[in-house]
Regions:
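Thiamine diphosphate
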Residues: 1-49
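General beta-strand structural signal in soluble alpha/beta enzymes
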Residues: 17, 80-82, 106
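Conserved beta-strand scaffold positions in the cores of enzyme catalytic domains, especially
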Residues: 44, 79-81, 103
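Conserved thiamine diphosphate
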Residues: 58-94
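Long, charge-dense
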Residues: 47-57
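Short active-site-adjacent structural elements
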Residues: 53-55, 90-91, 111-117
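Glycine/aspartate-rich loop-and-adjacent alpha/beta segment that forms the canonical ThDP
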Residues: 98-139
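Short, solvent-exposed amphipathic alpha-helical segments in soluble enzyme
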Residues: 32-36, 61, 96-97, 120-124
């Protein structure tokens, strides 16, 4: 919902929302609200590994979540899928050129880099950095 509000408040900025499939499933009620508001500058990317990676890779649900089908069902006007590097590149180019609310579902495998560290900033520092960024006027 943060990305939706940013997109509505900053209609001249392209807003990319990155979501995991587990997070999208837990906040499923947000999708119809976003679809109803239809911000043309919002690209909603769902990274779908069919698992809650941050809690040990527990499966999200039997058979996984098809975020693209859910987005289409609730009214997202443009829905794209990427299943490999080639389709990802094509879908990203399409999403960049879209002038309408777009969902891009990206399939990937469960797993993280072994050298992936923990955040080095606090949630308050992250909030302050985001607020400062949003106050900047970009051409």
């Amino acid at each position: 919902m943060i990305a939706l509000e940013i997109a509505l408040e900053k209609p001249n900025r392209r807003v990319w929302c990155l979501d995991g499939d587990g997070a999208a499933l837990m906040h499923l009620g947000a999708l119809p609200v976003i679809a109803q508001r239809k911000p043309a500058n919002l690209i909603h990317v769902v990274i779908n590994n069919a698992a809650h990676e941050t809690v040990g890779g527990m499966p999200v649900c039997e058979g996984g979540l098809c975020a693209a089908k859910v987005a289409s069902a609730v009214g997202y006007p443009r829905v794209l899928n990427a299943r490999d590097e080639a389709t990802l590149e094509t879908a990203l180019q399409e999403a960049k050129g879209a002038n309408q609310l777009t969902m891009l579902e990206v399939a990937c495998a469960v797993g993280a880099r072994a050298d992936l560290g923990r955040p080095t900033t606090t949630p308050i520092q992250n909030r302050d950095a985001l607020m400062a960024f949003l106050r900047e006027e970009k051409a």
